[in-house]
Regions:
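Membrane-embedded and interfacial regions of multi-pass energy-transducing membrane proteins
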Residues: 1-51, 55-426
Length: 426
């Protein structure tokens, strides 16, 4: 997907005009209508951006399930997080370039994030935009960053990621180090040649993926408004603010976190903290068992709650910025954070007293956050009370079951020394 995005982006850049008066029409007319196959290249680039994030999210969650962030792959995981951050920056920079209504105002909101930094925030925002508002200097800078700087950085990070992968080897669904069991020639007993086994396997997966990919390219390039916002079919109007400003679908969960905390600085900290949690996974989960196959049932429940809460946040953010959606976003953010912060609980067997302490402390933290939100008049106390059951119920379910069924917190007693053919939850 990276190669496809670079190739299509190169052809789009040939015909694109980074000028506020020409940008929108260079996309709509020059690329979409006047250039041979320009519509196809543009649609492949738009759909490819979303497809890239789908693959990255699946790859990251697979790594979480099978413990690919644990020793000796901590550095490999951190490089992958940096790739994700660079990809997010690349997507944000490219979002402004069509100069549509949602592109303009979405970029205006994001560039204002840095103004939350005390003292130096406003000068940094002005330097980033090149002016007091988004205009020609901003568009030129974002175009150069999107076309040149970030692709080079992405390629460099991918290269370093592959070098690190070559040093430590890839993980597997069993979490077994195949290099610890070699034959007389030094070849891992469970190792197989890359060709034809991996090439045939990957060829099947790539073929199935491209069937879905090109269906969207030819039949639904806008993705029902998710891949390409409907407001971007109108040129940017700096005098008319849309009633609802939201990012593309792959950033919606983070937008819900940001929107759930009305204070700008704390909202940005909540948003940035989600990335920090991913980077801190090697420190939070220090259980020697890697794969989810051999972890406890409650650990599996917690790992399943991660993507579910992430998707729930995206669903909330897609709605209007009503007080109900803001409060729901706050509470689901608490669940998302909890799925990471309770990981140390599963590092070793816990006594009932320790489990009860974890439950009391976790519930206390949730209530302290809600009391603080009420104290700054962020949301009404009645609405907070009516919705506080969301994170409280999750924590009560997790630790309550640990108290009632201690066996559900224990990992498998037997760990294989060689690869097996079991399923995900084997």
């Amino acid at each position: 997907m990276l190669v496809l995005q670079l190739a299509t982006g190169l052809f789009l850049a040939i015909h694109y005009q980074p000028n506020p008066h020409l940008a929108y029409w260079s996309v709509l007319r020059t690329i979409q209508r006047d250039s041979h196959w320009g519509w196809l290249i543009r649609d492949m680039h738009v759909v490819g951006a979303s497809a890239f994030f789908v693959l990255v999210y699946l790859h990251m969650y697979r790594g979480i399930m099978y413990g690919s962030y644990k020793k000796p792959r901590e550095l490999l995981w951190l490089i992958g997080i940096f790739i994700y951050l660079a990809l997010a920056a690349e997507a944000f920079l490219g979002y402004l370039l069509p100069w549509g209504q949602m592109s303009y105002w979405g970029s205006a909101v994001v560039t204002n994030f840095v103004t939350a930094i005390p003292v130096i925030g406003k000068p940094i925002a002005q330097w980033l935009r090149g002016s007091f508002v988004i205009g020609l200097p901003t568009l030129n800078r974002f175009f150069i960053f999107h076309v040149f700087l970030m692709p080079v950085l992405l390629l460099a990070l991918v290269l370093v990621h592959m070098i690190a992968l070559h040093q430590v080897g890839s993980n597997n669904p069993d979490g077994v180090e195949i290099h610890d069991n070699v034959n007389e020639t030094g070849w891992p007993r469970d190792g197989i040649p890359f060709h034809p086994y991996y090439t045939v396997k990957d060829l099947f997966g790539v073929s199935a993926f491209f069937v879905v990919f090109f269906w969207f390219v030819f039949y639904r390039p806008d993705g029902w408004g998710f891949l390409l916002d409907k407001l971007n079919y109108t040129p940017a109007n700096i005098l008319h603010t849309p009633s609802d400003i939201h990012p593309l679908w792959f950033f919606l969960p983070f937008y819900a976190m940001l929107r759930g905390v009305p204070d700008k600085l704390y909202g940005i900290l909540a948003f940035a903290g989600s990335f920090a949690l991913l980077a801190c996974l090697p420190l939070l989960d220090r259980n020697p068992v890697r794969s989810i196959r051999y972890r406890s049932p409650l650990y599996k429940l917690n790992i399943l709650a991660m993507p579910l809460s992430f998707l729930w946040l995206g669903y909330i953010a897609h709605g209007f910025a009503t007080e109900h959606n803001m409060v729901y976003g706050l509470h689901v953010t608490e669940i998302f954070y909890a799925t990471f912060l309770v990981l140390p609980f599963f590092n070793k067997p816990r006594s009932p007293r320790v489990t009860l302490t974890w439950l009391i402390l976790a519930e206390a933290v949730v209530w302290m956050i809600d009391v603080w939100m009420y104290s700054i008049h962020a949301h009404g106390w009645g609405l907070m009370l009516l919705t506080d059951w969301i994170p409280s119920l999750y924590l009560l379910l997790l630790f309550g079951m640990a108290l009632l069924r201690p066996a559900w917190t224990r990992d498998a007693a037997y760990l294989p020394e060689r690869l097996t053919a079991g399923g995900i939850f084997h």
